[in-house]
Amino acid sequence: GLVGSEMCIRDSLVGVSFASASQITLSHTDRSNPDSFHAERRSLLNKYAGFAKRHFNSTGQHLDIVDLHYADKQKRASGKTPLRYNTYWTGSILVGSPPQAAPVVFDTGSSDLILDKSFYNPKKSLSANNLNTPFDFSYINLHVYGDIYSDHVAIGDVKADNVPIGHGREDFDGDLAGGKFGLSFSTAENSGFDVKQDPFIWAAKKQNPIQSSSFQFTLRRSGKATLNVGDVDHSELAGPISWADENTDKTFWRTSVELNGNKIENAIVDSGTNVITGPNDQVKAVLDQLDGVWVEQSPDGTYQGRYSCQNPPNLHFTVAGQTFKLSSDAINFGYAGDKCFLAMGGTLGLNDWILGSPFMELGSVIFNYDTRRMGFAKAR
C-alpha cells in the first residue's frame, strides 16, 4: 500500500550522504500559572494585529482576523503587556558556519525566521551574508527590529543555504526562547522581510532531495515529542492519516473542525500560541455545553473555563473525519488549589478561532506545503 511504499522510499535513502528527512526532539516547559491567560490573549491580539496592519499596508485590504481598533485601544490602555511564561514547545536549530545552536519556537502562525542576538552572531559565521535590508515590525508583545542576513540553516540533518534570517538587535526578554521559526506561508501580507531569498522549507526542497516539503509535529507530554522535516515518519503513528481539504488561505494554515460537536469554520492552526481561543461569545457557547466546566467571566468580559482537577472534562475534536480526544495535560492551563483552568477561553476583538498548541497535542499533525494540506493521525 501507499504507507509501505512511502516507508520503503524513506528507508532506501537512509544510507545516502545527503539527508532526505530528519527528526529533532522538542521540549516543553511546565504550564504557566492561570494569571498568564490574560497575557496570552493580549499577545495573540498583538500578533495578529501586526499581521493585519502589514496586510493592509501591502494590499490596501483589511484582514478580518482581528478588530484593529479594539486591539490598538487595548494596547494604548494597558502600557506594558504582562510577560508570558515561556511554555512553548521548542527545538534547536543550527545556523551559520561554524554552526551556532539556537533554541526556537516553531510557529505555524507566522512566516519569518528571527533570532535573538544572544544566539546568532552573523559576524562569527563565514557563510553569513548581510542583505542590507532592515526589518522592523511588531510580533506578539515585542518590537522586533534589526538586519536581515542569509545563512546556512539546519533542522537536524536537513540543511538549506541562503535562508533569510532576521538578526534582532535586542534580546527577546524571555518572551520567546531564542527566536521563532515561522512555518506559515511566506507572503507579502504576513512576512516582515522584503527579500527574494526562499524561506527554509522551499530552499531545502530546491537544494536537497527531501521527500516532501512537510513538517510533522508529534507533541507528547510523556514520551518523546518530535518534529520531522522532509517526510512523514510513520513509526510515530498509531493509525491512518486523515487529510483535511486543500488550504485555500494564501497566508495561514486553516481547517474546519468540530469541538464536542460544535462546528468551527476555517480556524487557524497556530503552534506559536499556547491556548485555544476564538470570538468571546462563540467560546462561551462551547464552554456552556461542557460537562463539569464552570464558565468564569473576567473583569474585562472575557470567558474562560474552570474545572475540578480530579475530574477533567472530555474535549474532543473531529477533523478531516477523524475524532481525537485531548489529554488532561493538554487542556490544563494551570491550577489554583484543586481547581484547574482550561486552556481555552474567549478573546474580545478576535473574529476567528485560533487553535494553539493544546489542539496540536491531539496526536501527530502534518503540514504539507506541496499540497497545502494538513494531515492528522493518532500518535503511538
Located regions from the model:
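Cytochrome P450 catalytic domain signature, combining two hallmark sequence patches
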Residues: 119-134, 201-204, 243-245, 284-300
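Short, small-residue-biased leader/transition segments that mark boundaries at the very start
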Residues: 2-9
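Aspartic protease core domain of the pepsin/retropepsin superfamily
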Residues: 158-249, 338-380
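Signature of the N-terminal lobe/flap region of pepsin-like aspartyl proteases
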Residues: 75, 83-169, 289, 312-316
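Disordered propeptide/prodomain
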Residues: 10-103, 244-248
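Aspartic protease catalytic domain
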Residues: 20-57, 170-171, 314-380
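Extracytoplasmic, non-cytosolic globular domains
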Residues: 265-308
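Short hydrophobic beta-strand that contains or immediately precedes a catalytic carboxylate
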Residues: 93-95, 102-107, 113-115, 267-271, ...
